[in-house]
Amino acid sequence: MILEKIVETTKDRINQEKRRLPEEVIKKSATEMAIKQGFGSSSSISRDKFFFEEVMSRPGVNFLCEIKRASPSKGMIAKDFDPVFIAKEYEEGGAAAISVLTEPTFFLGKDDYLMEVKKEVGIPVLRKDFILEAYQIYQAKLLGADCVLLIVSILTEEQLTGFLKICDELGLSALVETHNQEEVMRALQCGARIIGVNNRNLSTFEVSIENSLKLRTLVPKEAIFIAESGISTPEQIKELKEAGVNGVLIGETLMKASNKKLMIRNLKSLL
């Protein structure tokens, strides 16, 4: 299973990074940054304080546009790769937020890509990686991320609950990714405020937009619902809007487009 390989590789990467920069050091720096920004363990949770949540809860279908160089299912997606240029195209095209892959082995991502993008855009940035430890959440804060991805299928309920608490204390939103009914219910029980439904099965990599349409009814209206993967036409986005979806994560369709601004506008044409 490719997901299991990614998880094992990520564990090794975290251990190497911890040897270079111990967790107590990175935790202290991230916590101090959050306190300066008005967050911390005693701060109250208000959606408008969290940049990513405020943006993705706006009326209509909000576009979370992804920057990724490669993927296990498609191989190399973008040989000529300039993440800052792509991010600016996304922002000018009407993206609400940007997702940046930082996983280096299977997606050829880099932490530097996120830092560079964050400096150049005025919209929220999501760190998309395979988060297995709190260490990576502290990293995300220091990289400048506004949001992190938490994948239900690779975390225990105890981990997910704990990571959501850390995110709140750091002023980070958490997009909690699910794929089926059981995972959606687990995410909600753990306190997730943003539910993502991946239309791609991470075990088989098969894609079906019906997954988002089917699971939308399980998520309360006060939570943010984001449909992820396999979205490539204005008709699909119109259908998702009618189902009450708040946002869509679009990656490969945009990464392969020669004119990304035009592609975003085309995808929005039926809204």
From Swiss-Prot:
<dbReference type="GO" id="GO:0004640">
    <property type="term" value="F:phosphoribosylanthranilate isomerase activity"/>
</dbReference>
<keyword id="KW-0028">Amino-acid biosynthesis</keyword>
<dbReference type="InterPro" id="IPR013798">
    <property type="entry name" value="Indole-3-glycerol_P_synth_dom"/>
</dbReference>
<dbReference type="InterPro" id="IPR013785">
    <property type="entry name" value="Aldolase_TIM"/>
</dbReference>
<keyword id="KW-0210">Decarboxylase</keyword>
<dbReference type="GO" id="GO:0004425">
    <property type="term" value="F:indole-3-glycerol-phosphate synthase activity"/>
</dbReference>
<comment type="similarity">
    <text>Belongs to the TrpC family.</text>
</comment>
<dbReference type="GO" id="GO:0000162">
    <property type="term" value="P:L-tryptophan biosynthetic process"/>
</dbReference>
<protein>
    <recommendedName>
        <fullName>Indole-3-glycerol phosphate synthase</fullName>
        <ecNumber>4.1.1.48</ecNumber>
    </recommendedName>
</protein>
<dbReference type="InterPro" id="IPR001468">
    <property type="entry name" value="Indole-3-GlycerolPSynthase_CS"/>
</dbReference>
<dbReference type="InterPro" id="IPR011060">
    <property type="entry name" value="RibuloseP-bd_barrel"/>
</dbReference>
<keyword id="KW-0057">Aromatic amino acid biosynthesis</keyword>
<comment type="pathway">
    <text>Amino-acid biosynthesis; L-tryptophan biosynthesis; L-tryptophan from chorismate: step 4/5.</text>
</comment>
<dbReference type="Pfam" id="PF00218">
    <property type="entry name" value="IGPS"/>
</dbReference>
<dbReference type="InterPro" id="IPR045186">
    <property type="entry name" value="Indole-3-glycerol_P_synth"/>
</dbReference>
<keyword id="KW-0456">Lyase</keyword>
<keyword id="KW-0822">Tryptophan biosynthesis</keyword>
